[in-house]
Amino acid sequence: MRYAWPMQSADSLEQLRLKLAQFSSERDWDQFHSPKNLAMALVVEAGELVEHFQWLSPDESVNLVAADKREVAMEMADVLMFLVRLADKLDVDLIEVADQKLERNHLKYPVEKARGRATKYDKL
């Protein structure tokens, strides 16, 4: 499916994947989108996200002013887009692997042992 600009909002990871692939292809950026480069870009964007919280108290981090919240949202979008692009390049279904990981975590962190605790699974 080809999208015209401005693109309609994506309502699934698959639509977002397709839109990002088209965006990259139209600009001949696939040559730069190796898994290594995408992973590095993802980490850079995650670092930019963390910068917004670096010196805030836990309460301040929950109660961001609107302008800061918008900037945080934009950094979150950058992280998501690089993650989706990386998954596309490595042919990883993010929903499928997230479900698998959640199931593993369910087994590692049983409610009766982990509830209300921030302890690693091997120390429960």
Give the location of each predicted region.
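Flexible "arm" and connector segments at domain edges
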Residues: M1-M76, L80-L124
